[in-house]
Amino acid sequence: QDEEAATFHLTGNFLGKQRTFDFTFNLAEATTKNAFVPRLWASRRIAYLVDQIRQAGAAVVAQPTAGAAPIVHDPRYAELVNEIVRLSTEFGILTEYTAFLATEGTNLNNWNELIASCGYELNTKAVHTRSGIGAVNQAKNFNFQKGQTVLNRGNAYWNDQLQREANFKSVQQISDRAFFHRGDRWIDSRLVSNNITFAPMTVIKFGSDDHLHLLEELIRERRQGVLSLQGDIELLHEGRHVLITNDDC
């Protein structure tokens, strides 16, 4: 990753005067201990994007047009749907609009299908459900997510019966990575968010010398926790698509 220092410029009114403040961050000092920061940002970002679609849909619901295509098919909002799915898969963040990602039958190799499923959920719920208990739970989820200050590792949210959904064992957030369970295999979320569907280039057997070497590399990166998953693991590591096989799990 790019480890050059990054400078953040903040301009605004301070004590009645126009001021500019510069903050410099040394990215070389960043570690996986800070992995919660981008994940919190992604969660808040998803809430913001959903709210943009929901607000835009208000006019559609108020003045419906016969035969009109769902608002999520509008290129302006289709881009938002795509970004919601990308962030959800990359960071392993589930909402009521992307909970299908945890379902065993969902094909993670079909990006267009994932976009269509998310678009359907957004159109059905965020756009058209504006009253009753189904609207209340969406408001509760939005209010939590937009101001989120702690990780929601269990991906708990309020469903349309105002019950807490929190049983998503098929999605795991580990360090700055996320994994989806399919069959007897865990799949690195970056393979999904980057739409990588080709077969693994490298196969490593659990307990082999290559496996120990990979473990040492992950320890140096403080990402060794990803190898704690039971079963086979598809991992994107240093640009390589790796399959770790474990016949004993």
Regions found by a protein language model. Name each.
Residues Q1-R182, D188-L191, N195-I196, T202-F206, ...:
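An acidic, Ser/Thr-enriched
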Residues M201-L218, H241-C249:
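Long, folded non-catalytic interaction modules
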Residues E221, G225-C249:
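C-terminal partner/receptor-binding element of secreted or periplasmic proteins
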